[in-house]
Amino acid sequence: MTEGSFGVDHVTVAGRLDHVSLNLAPGTIVAVVGGDGAGKSTLMRVLAGALLVDSGRVRIPGPDRVGFVPTGAGFYPDLTVAENLRFAATAYRLGEVRFRGRRDYVLGLTGLGDFTERLAADLSGGMRQKLALALGTLHEPELLVLDEPTTGVDPVSRVDLWRIIADAAAGGVHVVLATSYIDEAERAGHVLALHAGRRLLEGAPSELTTAIPGVVSERHRPEERSRAWRRGTRWHEWTPAGLSVPGDEVAEPDLEDAVIVAALQREAADR
């Protein structure tokens, strides 16, 4: 991915990120994946301008051109949907005419038009996240930063939230999101996997799956448990390049397999 307008170059945050680089492109959704403690939320806060780095370069627009939806927040629970939108409009200094146009647009996009007088605290989990996205995109930011935007919501709401995110990207917004759902990351145009604050692998999802070194096999019982992981009722097992592959069927790997294989390689290299 070539250097875009926004991103980070070799940024370090002591104990959390170690020389991480990421370029964002307009109209492209970039997904950042990784386990607990990988550094996903830290990177989102850096990109949102909410956290200073110890070293490296951060390339982001001014605060009024960034939309940030932190995990589990992004709205005021004691305000109604309408009041939340009005508060955000005031914070971003939107004129009345522009506010009304944007308000009507985001309410229509999120399906919250019939709930404007409901307290945010009384919304369902999925509706709260839609409100948070409405607030994050109300001012038409150039950069939209989303920290775990679909965590804890039902499958239908996840689909709706992705539709809203895709709408922002289609409008030319730079979109970056952290997610624990690998299947969601496969919908992105570009993926960065972090492990213990370091870059694990990066690229388009299809490129990452085809670039897995060695062979991923699907089997009922693994031959080498240190290189195997459960996928449903069966196991996937990675055989490094150059080693013979036992006679089970070869799996068609996906992004989850690519991330796991990269983590196994990193662990072996760090020993």
Language-model segment annotations:
Residues 33-35:
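The feature captures the beta-strand-to-loop junction immediately N-terminal to the Walker
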Residues 48:
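Helix-to-loop junction immediately C-terminal to a conserved catalytic motif
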Residues 65, 231-271:
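C-terminal coupling/interaction segments
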Residues 144-148:
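Catalytic Walker B motif of ABC-type/P-loop ATPase nucleotide-binding domains
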Residues 160-176, 180-238:
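ABC transporter nucleotide-binding domain
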